[in-house]
Design a protein with these regions (language model features):
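Short alpha-helical transmembrane segments in multi-pass integral membrane proteins
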Residues: 1-27, 84-151, 193-249, 305-370, ...
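Transmembrane alpha-helix boundary and packing residues in multipass membrane permease domains
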Residues: 30, 34, 46, 63, ...
Length: 462
């Protein structure tokens, strides 16, 4: 099959397949990828928790570094991916290659800068992310290999998102799942069999992500994608580079504020000792796993929304958003029910310390209620980002961990003490829900009007 044939087949798949079947086919591998990624994050928490409470706290500190890596990768991946998908929807394959190449090589450059700066200032960097003096040696040992692999990790996120936006979620899944499973297998080998401790967890993450990078790059080099990577295709137009940054701004805001929010959470929790930092870290990792389901369904929506918006099939964009809302809510209800009935056992699985459990358990229960609001937040943000409404998408992306969370984490612990630390995230989620809902409802009505206008201008069928 020629490149042109693949492009035509992909166009018909994305614009004609019934919405429920299309989204589920794209969401299933994405959800699996997200779950595996979350599981290997939980595996790090589990194995590092076997060392000490201070080592367990290091996971929370380094998670803020991971959020920075994700912020850069998702900014370039989502930013180029939404443009690529819309260009493919309008059948412009040359532009797709141009934007793909630009984002990939930019990701490598950003990763090198992060690695150099991070390694040169490592102890101060870890303290800035919320480490205590007792956590610091573990955090530095854990972060060092991850920083070395940062260029490949950021580039992998770009490739993964481009594959998804092309509608090739199965190929994206192969790279991420392989890396995730390898990470889970390598953790105990490096940490305990080789006696490397927390440094072993970092080495396992870096090595598995390097292999994931190689697998994803192979997909592009072997012509399994419509867009391709060519250094000669990197855009020379500042306007196009700014389009990538604007399209990725919601992801950068979301992930960047996740890093800042995590840092502030660690700083607020460390006033109550290493057990508080470890407890909040465990809760955050568990809910990253739960939220990965909603985000996975939302990522199944993104290429569908982008492709069909570019093809001016607005009714399909609306149907896709509504179906995603329903599917994400049902899946979250099931997950929360299971976790609620096993809450204490779940927390003790990662660190069997009464002090850690005393902090984590109330925070976990508060979060269980708030997480059911996430489908509206996720669908609103991802829909706007996918159709190129960068301003609205960026604002909503900044609400959860920025506009709502940061004022709360600065005020509530001073007023309510440790309870304030535990309540910040669920209250921020509730506020973000009430902000996102009217934006989403208004846009769904707008899509309906745009579809009617498009139908009225369509040529009569003979």
């Amino acid at each position: 099959m020629t490149q042109q044939d693949r492009t035509v087949v992909q166009y018909h798949k994305m614009t004609e397949t019934p919405i429920p079947r299309l989204i589920l086919s794209l969401a299933a591998p994405t959800i699996l990828s997200m779950l595996i990624t979350s599981i290997y994050n939980l595996a790090d928490t589990f194995f590092v928790g076997r060392i000490s409470t201070s080592a367990s706290g290091a996971v929370g500190v380094v998670s803020s570094l991971m959020a920075i890596i994700q912020a850069l990768g998702f900014m370039l991946g989502h930013g180029s991916g939404t443009i690529i998908s819309r260009r493919l929807g309008s059948q412009d394959t040359h532009a797709a290659t141009r934007f793909a190449s630009t984002s990939f090589f930019t990701a490598l450059a950003f990763g090198v800068v992060l690695a150099v700066v991070g390694l040169a200032t490592l102890p101060d960097f870890m303290m800035l992310l919320g480490s205590t003096e007792t956590i610091l040696p573990h955090a530095c040992a854990y972060a060092r290999p991850i920083l070395l692999a940062a260029p490949l990790m950021i580039s992998s996120l770009v490739m993964n998102n481009i594959l998804r936006y092309e509608g090739k979620a199965n190929l994206a899944m192969i790279g991420l799942v392989t890396g995730g499973l390898l990470n889970i297998a390598l953790d105990p080998l490096f940490m305990f069999a080789l006696g490397l401790g927390t440094a072993g967890a970092g080495i396992a993450t870096a090595l598995s992500q390097t292999i994931s990078f190689g697998i994803l790059l192979y997909m592009f080099l072997r012509g399994k994608t419509v867009s391709q990577f060519r250094l000669s295709a990197v855009t020379r137009e500042p306007r196009e580079f700014l389009q990538i940054l604007a399209g990725g701004a919601p992801s950068f805001g979301r992930q960047g504020l996740n890093s800042i929010g995590g840092m502030l959470l660690n700083i607020a929790a460390r006033s109550y000792g290493d057990a508080a930092v470890a407890g909040m870290s465990i809760v955050s990792r568990i809910f990253m796993f739960i939220l990965s389901v909603a985000i996975g369904v939302g990522q199944g929506l993104q290429p569908v929304a982008s492709f069909n918006y570019g093809a001016r099939k607005y009714h399909r964009v609306r149907q896709a958003a509504i179906f995603t809302l329903k599917a994400a809510f049902v899946l979250l209800v099931v997950l929360i029910a299971v976790c609620w009935w096993n809450d204490e056992a779940l927390i003790r699985l990662f660190r069997d310390d009464p002090e850690v459990t005393a902090v984590a358990l109330p925070a976990f229960r508060y979060q269980c209620f708030a997480v059911l609001l996430q489908p509206v937040i996720v669908v609103a943000n991802m829909t706007f980002q996918s159709v190129g409404k960068a301003g609205r998408a960026t604002f909503l992306a900044c609400c959860r961990q920025g506009v709502c969370f940061i004022p709360l984490i600065l005020v509530l612990p001073r007023v309510l003490g440790l309870v304030g630390v535990e309540l910040c995230q669920p209250i921020a989620d509730a506020l973000t829900f009430f902000i996102s809902l009217p934006f989403l409802l208004a846009f769904l009505r707008q899509l309906e009007q745009m579809d009617k206008a498009e139908a009225s201008h369509a040529p009569a069928q003979l």
